[in-house]
Amino acid sequence: MASLVAVQPVAVKGLAGSSISGRKLAVRPSPRALCRTTRRPRAAVVAKYGEKSVYFDLEDIGNTTGQWDLYGSDAPSPYNPLQSKFFETFAGPFTKRGLLLKFLLLGGGSLVAYVSASASPDLLPIKKGPQLPPTPGPRGKI
């Protein structure tokens, strides 16, 4: 903390002194603040590569930023080999967004075509025709 004391200010060229009720005031740091600033830290803070989950090395940018072309590890697959073979074989064509979108559009279109073709034709009121005899309106007209 700083304490305000009435002392003779040092004239600094280009800076005007502050005046409160005619006295020039200068800011002098408290003795506690002086002690804190003169102390040295007990230990320097050093982050080593890989220590405490801090991974940063300018010499090894590949490991620092990650291998962007590699999305897995070299560990063996935790899945059943038959399951892995199935997904590699049959899900291979759908790895691209465009192919997956085309597959979904074709599947959805064929589903709509099948449902509309297999629906009974008399669902629409125009196909069913009138079910009850017409009732006359308020003036006796149909």
Swiss-Prot record:
It comes from the Eukaryota. Gene3D superfamilies: 1.20.5.220. The keyword Transit peptide applies. Keywords: Chloroplast, Membrane, Photosynthesis, Photosystem I, Plastid, Thylakoid, Transit peptide, Transmembrane, Transmembrane helix. It is found in: Plastid, Chloroplast thylakoid membrane. InterPro entries: PSI_PsaH. One of its GO terms (biological process) is photosynthesis. GO terms for cellular component: chloroplast thylakoid membrane; photosystem I reaction center. Possible role could be the docking of the LHC I antenna complex to the core complex. The chain crosses the membrane at residues 101-119. It is a single-pass membrane protein. The keyword Plastid applies. This is Photosystem I reaction center subunit VI, chloroplastic. Residues 1-47 form a transit peptide. Coiled coil: none annotated. Belongs to the psaH family. Pfam families: PSI_PsaH.
